[in-house]
C-alpha cells in the first residue's frame, strides 16, 4: 500500500484524497519526518483562500503540530473561516494542543539537551501575546519562568512562580505540573537556603493538596531537593511519605487508578 502510494506521489499526483491516504500510511510506518515533509510541501504552498477547506483542515489536524508553521499561522489568521468548515471546538482544541506542545518543549529543556533555540522561544512568546484564549496566561507564565531556569537564576525562578500563582493563571490542574517541573530545577542550585525554600514550599503545597497521587509526586520532588542539600535522612523520610501517599491513592481508587511512573 505504502509503495503504491509513494509511486503515485512521486509521479506528481496531489489530490487531497491521495495525500490523506499517503500521510496516514507514512504515519502507520512511523515515518514522521517524511510525513511532516509531505504535509508541509503541499500545505505551505496554499494561499489563505486555498487552504480553508474541510479536506485541508483534516490534513492540518492530523499532520501539523508546530504553532509557528505556516499552516497553523494561517488557521489563526483565518480563524472564523476555519470555525465554519471544522467547528469552533475542534479548531480551538487543535490550537491549544499545538501551542501547549511547543511550550512544553521549551519548559522541559535542560542544559544537556543541546543548544537552546532563542529565536523560536521569542517567536512563540510573540505569537502567544497576540492571542486571547483562557490557556494563554498559563502558557506565557511557563515560558517566562523557564527563562530563569535556563539562566540558573533560581531566586528569579521562585519569584516568577510566586507571581504566576498570585494571578491564578493556570487551569485544569496545570499548576501541579508547572510547580513540579520548576521546583525540581532547584536540584541544580548550590544555594542551600534557596533549595530549602523550595522544600518548604513543597510542604505547604502538599498540605493544601487533596489528591494523594499529587502528594506522592510532591514528596518525590522533596526527596530530590533534600538529597541536593545533603540531607539523606530527610530524603529517605520523604521517600517513605511518597510511598505512603501512593498506597493511599491506590486504596482510595479501589485499585482502579495507578500513578504515572517517572522515567528519570
Residue ranges and their predicted role:
Residues 1-264:
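Oxidative protein folding and maturation machinery
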Amino acid at each position: 500500500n505504502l509503495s503504491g502510494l509513494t509511486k503515485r506521489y512521486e509521479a506528481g499526483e496531489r489530490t487531497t484524497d491521495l495525500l490523506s491516504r499517503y500521510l496516514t500510511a507514512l504515519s502507520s510506518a512511523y515515518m514522521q519526518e517524511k510525513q511532516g515533509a509531505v504535509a508541509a510541501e503541499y500545505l505551505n504552498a496554499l494561499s489563505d483562500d486555498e487552504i480553508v477547506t474541510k479536506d485541508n483542515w483534516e490534513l492540518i489536524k492530523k499532520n501539523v503540530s508546530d504553532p509557528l508553521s505556516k499552516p497553523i499561522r494561517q488557521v489563526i489568521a483565518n480563524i472564523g473561516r476555519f470555525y465554519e468548515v471544522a467547528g469552533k471546538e475542534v479548531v480551538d482544541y487543535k490550537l491549544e494542543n499545538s501551542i501547549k506542545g511547543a511550550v512544553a518543549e521549551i519548559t522541559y529543556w535542560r542544559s544537556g539537551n543541546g543548544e537552546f533555540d532563542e529565536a523560536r522561544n521569542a517567536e512563540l512568546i510573540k505569537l502567544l501575546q497576540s492571542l486571547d484564549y483562557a490557556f494563554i496566561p498559563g502558557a506565557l507564565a511557563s515560558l517566562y519562568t523557564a527563562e530563569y531556569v535556563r539562566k540558573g537564576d533560581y531566586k528569579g525562578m521562585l519569584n516568577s512562580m510566586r507571581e504566576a500563582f498570585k494571578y491564578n493563571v493556570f487551569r485544569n490542574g496545570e499548576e501541579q505540573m508547572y510547580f513540579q517541573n520548576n521546583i525540581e530545577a532547584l536540584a541544580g542550585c548550590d544555594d542551600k537556603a534557596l533549595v530549602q525554600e523550595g522544600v518548604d514550599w513543597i510542604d505547604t503545597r502538599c498540605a493544601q493538596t487533596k489528591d494523594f497521587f499529587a502528594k506522592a509526586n510532591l514528596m518525590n520532588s522533596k526527596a530530590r531537593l533534600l538529597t541536593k542539600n545533603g540531607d539523606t535522612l530527610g530524603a529517605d523520610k520523604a521517600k517513605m511519605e511518597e510511598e505512603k501517599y501512593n498506597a493511599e491513592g491506590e486504596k482510595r481508587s479501589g485499585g482502579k487508578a495507578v500513578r504515572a511512573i517517572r522515567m528519570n
